[in-house]
């Protein structure tokens, strides 16, 4: 059964939606690479300074897994295309983020990157052995 989500409207999303079934966030997470080797992920500006951090902590692991997948897929770049992909993967949480600004800062960041056409870097942080 297909799940309905509220997409961020964009020219590129039609191709994404037509190329595969629309899945919910948990289903999307199940398809992404493992993150057990990470302690977190930094989002960095053009100077390499961390402007956002996602820890490997309860309540943040889904976002960490999604952002790590974006780092892999987009070679460490967080640009409008990567942000669009991330918003598709966040699925039903995007509508909740739009209705409650600040409740989902990791989604808010993707919306900002997309809307402002930002070019940031994703830096996964290895866990200590």
PLM regions: where:
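N-terminal, charged low-complexity regulatory/assembly segments
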Residues: 25, 50-54, 65-69, 97-100, ...
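Short intrinsically disordered terminal tails
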Residues: 19-20, 129
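Amphipathic alpha-helical interaction modules
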Residues: 42-80
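Short, compact, well-ordered microdomains
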Residues: 84-128
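A cross-kingdom feature marking charged/low-complexity
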Residues: 33, 38-49, 112-129
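A cross-taxon signal for low-complexity, glycine/charged-rich
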Residues: 1-6, 11-16
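N-terminal, charge-rich interaction modules
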Residues: 22-37, 52-57
């Amino acid at each position: 059964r297909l799940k309905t989500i509220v997409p961020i409207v964009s020219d590129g999303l039609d191709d994404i939606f037509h190329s595969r079934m629309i899945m919910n966030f948990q289903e999307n997470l199940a398809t992404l690479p493992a993150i057990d080797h990470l302690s977190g992920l930094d989002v960095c500006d053009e100077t390499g300074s961390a402007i956002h951090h996602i820890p490997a902590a309860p309540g943040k692991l889904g976002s960490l897994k999604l952002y790590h997948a974006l780092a892999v897929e987009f070679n460490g770049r967080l640009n409008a295309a990567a942000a669009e992909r991330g918003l598709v993967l966040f699925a039903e949480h995007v509508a909740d983020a739009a209705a409650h600004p600040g409740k989902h800062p990791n989604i808010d960041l993707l919306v900002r990157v997309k809307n402002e056409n930002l070019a940031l870097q994703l830096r996964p942080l290895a866990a200590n052995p």
